Amino acid sequence: VFNEFFETPENSPARKRPGIYDVRYFEEGGKRLQVLLLDTRYFRGPIVLLPKRGRNGPYDRNLDPEVTVLGGAQWKWLEEELQKPADIRIIATSIQFLPVDHNWELWQNFPHERQRMLDLLRETKTGPVIFVSGDRHMGELMELPAGDKQSPGSPVYEMTTSGLTNAGGGQKGEPNRYRVSPTNFQSRNFGLLQIDWATQLVTMQLCDIDGKVVDEYKADLSQ
């Protein structure tokens, strides 16, 4: 149903395998943009509940090293794709990747899988990447700096946006050590990425439902 609705080409490998992960390429003026679309639901193991729900969410960390987010085949595919040439890479994930301070759905529900992603970015020498995510019913902009002990060697950026019809998730100003703006944006919003190919700067923008920019941050992908 997903492939039919989004008109996935009939000859696409995405139609012949479990899950809905895929990749798209866009080229302009000799520059190449790679957009990796991950499936973080189909293969994901169980989420563990906290004994008592806290202010920042109901989920605990699943420390079972055998539990996966992407599944073996998708991890292998991702490693192969990250080694293909691209000037800028964007990774789309339905759940937040960088945050580690809340207990809603996020990659940190499975710390070993989040670390596996960072290790893969380091091993493939991918360079700076931008994650785009949703699920949280709010918006925020983030950066894992190159100098951070968890960094894969280059900065990792993330833009989370709400749905177009629903917002108000989480807590205003909930903890997030990687957020680069004073707080999160609780009203309905959408995101824009403005790419300057000459400087390798990507301006991440959060916009309200009227199109007004309410937050922005420049991601330096030349590092």
Predicted features by range, described:
Residues V1-Q223:
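Long, structured stretches of catalytic cores involved in phosphate-ester chemistry, encompassing
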